[in-house]
Amino acid sequence: MAKMTTEEAFVKVLQMHGIEHAFGIIGSAFMPISDIFPDAGITFWDVAHETNGGLIADGYTRATGKMSMVVAQNGPGITGLVTPIKTAYWNHTPLLLVTPQAANKTMGQGGFQEVEQMNLFKDMVCYQEEVRDPSRICLLYTSP
């Protein structure tokens, strides 16, 4: 039996949770995952600004009742999600927010566009997790 890549495991978990639509901006950290989306039945909606992606995801989920995903890029892309994520939180809209982070060995040292994401979103989400070991990705997204 062939081993799954981290990207394949991540997309499989998205499918398990019924994610069919993702909104946002894809950068280099997310490209290997987005390459798998079409075959997995996930439509990615590229937007001009991460804030727009978050607002569209919130609206889509409220209108359809189906959870969607928001993708952002480092630094300003992440901070641009504050308004839509807080709006979704206040409206009890289930969203999955996926953001990249500085490399593990540079975290806390002012890495390129590093943002304290866990602290930034702690009052805006019901659950959050930071993945530092790619081999644990499927465990984190299948645990409550």
Model-found features: residue ranges?
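A short acidic, often aromatic-flanked loop/helix-cap motif at beta-alpha or helix-coil junctions
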Residues: 50-54, 134-139
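Aromatic/hydrophobic pocket-lining residues that form the small-molecule binding cavity
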Residues: 7, 81, 137
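Glycine/threonine-rich beta-strand-loop-alpha-helix active-site module
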Residues: 76-126
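Conserved small/polar residues in nucleotide/adenosyl-binding loops
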Residues: 141-144
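Conserved beta-strand segments of alpha/beta enzyme cores
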Residues: 43, 126-127
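Thiamine diphosphate
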Residues: 1-77
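Short acidic-hydrophobic, aromatic-tinged amphipathic segments that line or gate anion-handling sites
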Residues: 129-133
